[in-house]
């Protein structure tokens, strides 16, 4: 009896979309009311003339189909922030997050997710892709790999288009891209791929990549032999490049010293 009840609860909370090409499932994870957001804005001294609080915001976790570096299908995930009780068609905004080593993502009113919520409460449909290999997605994350970042954006756009149709949400086809740190790199990658390969499907209204890695080779050449604060970035990048391009002749792990090699 308990097992049947548990299955019923799961089936009610998760919505599967078998008829769609990209959207696999979605689940409402949270609602932020206007009152909560106004209080948060006041607490952090955010002026409403900068970021108006117009709507409460529902947050959905979206599971969708994307692609691995070899072209095979892979599941990816992201959060989707939807204004509550809005009228008319709304623009779409993608916010790309910075470097994250942990796979898990939780909905929270902090970090770049505040940016998504700020856009959503002002009347935008806001997407927050976790990137392939992070969140509820399959495989491991390919760090700073432009193709992987771009596909996580483009395929999530396709998934939320199917979600919008299912939920009766209207988009006005304006598309804004932004992101910070690795998210700036992902923003440029997505904009470039849309412009070069998918310009009949999507039109980017504007993009704002922020503080991205402009020159990874040049910067790493200057710091990789010195002590610096974020030692995990270089192996994260090297292992991702090896997965994507198979560039190392032999075992890539031989470049790391012990005891770090065993940990990595």
Model-derived features with residue positions:
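Accessory cap/linker subdomain of secreted extracellular hydrolases
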Residues: 210-264
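Primarily recognizes the serine-hydrolase "nucleophile elbow" in alpha/beta-hydrolase
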Residues: 159-229
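A fold-wide structural signal in alpha/beta-hydrolase
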Residues: 92, 120-130
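Short, surface-exposed "cap/lid" segments of acyl-processing enzymes
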Residues: 69-77, 81-119, 136
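Serine-hydrolase catalytic-loop signature spanning alpha/beta hydrolases and amidase-signature enzymes
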Residues: 100-102, 126, 159
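Sec-dependent N-terminal signal peptides
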Residues: 4-13
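Catalytic-loop region of hydrolases
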Residues: 18-87
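Alpha/beta-hydrolase active-site loop
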Residues: 143-166
